[in-house]
């Protein structure tokens, strides 16, 4: 089973983002992630046979906000800023593989051969901001893929202090 830990945006943040995307219009060149899949990854564990032991419960709850956008090859994302996020991600295992942690919310995917599609949207969303919110829990998510695409489901919850 493919597992990762994440923070889920609250409904008011999801609604604000949905409204902004509706205002901007839909671009068929991008494969948009459904709002039910929006999350901020803390740690990625890959395909593992059992649930990892995680010491996340009771850690300080980070205050987060969306500010700005960017791209990875083939991925359009929103930047997640906030105090305490890097520490929580580190506790969840981010960076253990030697890669730098980049807090983000994946919005869409596009053909790597067409980087301009993602870059144009990143520019359009660069000024998008949300009010801060406090992430009161981290979740362990399972990723499932079928003919309809990828879906995520919460396996465990870790309450945070704050």
Locate predicted features:
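Histidine-dependent nucleotide/RNA phosphoesterase domain, centered on the 2H-phosphoesterase fold
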Residues: 1-162
